[in-house]
Amino acid sequence: MRIVLFCENKYAIDILHPIQVEADREGGNEVLWYVHKKKISDFPLKDDVRWTTSMQETYDFMPEAIFVPGNIVPYYLPGVKIQIFHGYAAEKKDHWIIRRYFDCYFTQGPYFTKKFKELSLKYRDFEVLETGWPRQDWIAEHRHDFDEERLQLLKRYGKQQIVLYAPTFSPKLTSLPVIKDNLVKLCKQKDVLLLMKFHPLTRQEWVDEYKALAAQYDNMVFVDDYSVTKYMLMADVMISDTSSTIYEFLLLDKPVVTLNAISKDIYWKNITDPNMLCDAIDEVVKNEDYIRLRKWVISNYDPYTDGKVVHRMLEGARDFIRRKGVPKKRKLNLWRQYTSIKTFGRIKKKK
């Protein structure tokens, strides 16, 4: 099968990479990464995979399946267009918007499947298959790879716990402008090493501000890395606000504290005053109610820790093609066509 991994944003890299790994393991597949150069100036896998920044080259590849962890894919590309999502943040309005770009939605777990199947009955132009989320395959394989590094970090800094601060980048939702003093208080009062890992789209002034802050405290470390997953595996507790990484951390069965989360349903400890941070961390670690809530999230949001998520995705794509053939393009209204062309440009079609 000819596969395009459609990488518009940097955060998509480690969502898509497990598909490359499984496609290679299977054999008989050709994989091409489309990398959107306007948003990804330096592609970390440039020496390891076949990739292009050219939409024309992507079209000429004649893909049979396109995997997309974003909201849009050019309608004029051939291939079954598959939405695989960029996280679990169901409270964000755009998570449930059907933009008509996709032939299939491969959902993470029962909670998402139920809602997208309801939407499929309304729109009648896409299918829904529950597969799990591809990054979980990487986690299943590497869950304990960083245990020794974690122990060495704690030993080096002389601390008992690792706390990960992973805020969202959205200026309207982020805790970055108001939480700084209480992160300092946490580092002074608790026996913790604080790792700070920001979203790639975070404003540069906030990045610079917190890098400078970390330089002032021995047990505060600013992490420069495109992937947060490694640090989630090493951390004991997460602090956030309204980020899809909250759910990823809960799926590891680990406690989360948020400041002013906008979620309608809260499965963790949410505070509305940053001064409550230190006490909240103590509470969320020990409280049985939060443990039960995490178990519910695991069962409903993504129970697939078997390491076979991508296998199900590839089989799902092949099954669609067996039944319906390879779509030549996606039928869209003029506005969606215009948006596609404005974002990714035009191509010369083969005659």
For the regions a language model picked out, list residue spans one by one.
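Donor nucleotide-activated moiety binding/catalytic core segment of transferases
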Residues: T52-E57, T202-Y247
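C-terminal amphipathic helix plus adjacent low-complexity
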Residues: K286-K351
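Conserved catalytic-core segment of nucleotide-activated headgroup transferases in glycan assembly
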Residues: A12-G27, R135-Y210, T305, V309-H311
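Active-site and donor-binding regions of nucleotide-sugar-utilizing enzymes
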Residues: V4-R143, D147
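Catalytic donor nucleotide-activated moiety binding site of glycosyltransferases and closely related
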Residues: L32-K46, C187-F222
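A donor-sugar binding/catalytic signature common to diverse glycosyltransferases
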Residues: I72, L77-F85, D225-W268
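Catalytic binding pocket for nucleotide-activated donors in carbohydrate/polymer assembly enzymes
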Residues: Y123-R124, E130, S244-T305
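Short beta-strand scaffold positions
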Residues: V35, V68, T107, S240-D241, ...
